[in-house]
Amino acid sequence: SLHDALPILFSAQMILSAISTEKIDKTLETLLSAPVSRLSVLTSKMLAAGVVAALQAVVYMFGMSKMTGGLTEGMGDTSAYESAMENFGLTMSIGQYALVGIQMFVSILISLSLSMVLGALAKDAKSAQTMLLPITFSAMIPYLLAMVVDIRTLSPVIKYIVYAIPFTHTFMASENVMFGNYSLYAGGLIYQIVLLVVCMTVALKIFMSDKIFTMSIGGKQRTRKSFAFKKK
């Protein structure tokens, strides 16, 4: 549902805006030039973002449980309904809710690490908003597909392309744990953790290098154009 995509998008926008604003205002340069380990700076940012991500995952799971519980509030005696839902395997235990929350938490961490890298590439406020588009598309494509088709029934090529998008596994998490597809759930979670390590490694290399102060997407092309204009 849309409740799966919103925490990912909100957290990505939050950290991307923070990093890009710090870079544009030269606050990031001052911070990384201070007599403090850059690893400590990056770690503190990720810890703060991780706490926010954990809170968002908890709020998400609380909202999800309240939403599913609210569907039956106006039905009066719900014992027969609840029994039918249990017979069809359409209920989730606390442990299953926790599994879904864990995958949501990892997905938010992935979006945060990607946002840190993309935010470091922004050269102005306008480009910072554009940098959010890859994460938005990565979240919305599997979300929209999951609404209209069963991703597991797609052709192998398309299915594995969709599986390569890390957020796909988050949108399928509740379905997987509800119907006992724990192998697919575990595979998706392992893939997400590996991708998270890769994204964090890239972010660490960028923040540990002085290139973070000058690197940006499109900056060189703009310089060449301006030089050609001055030459004329």
Predicted regions and their residues:
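Short, small-residue-biased leader/transition segments that mark boundaries at the very start
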Residues: L2-L6
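Membrane-interfacial helix-loop-helix junctions in multi-pass membrane proteins
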Residues: G89-I94, L144-V194
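Junction motif at the cytosolic side of a transmembrane helix
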Residues: V117-D124, V194-K232
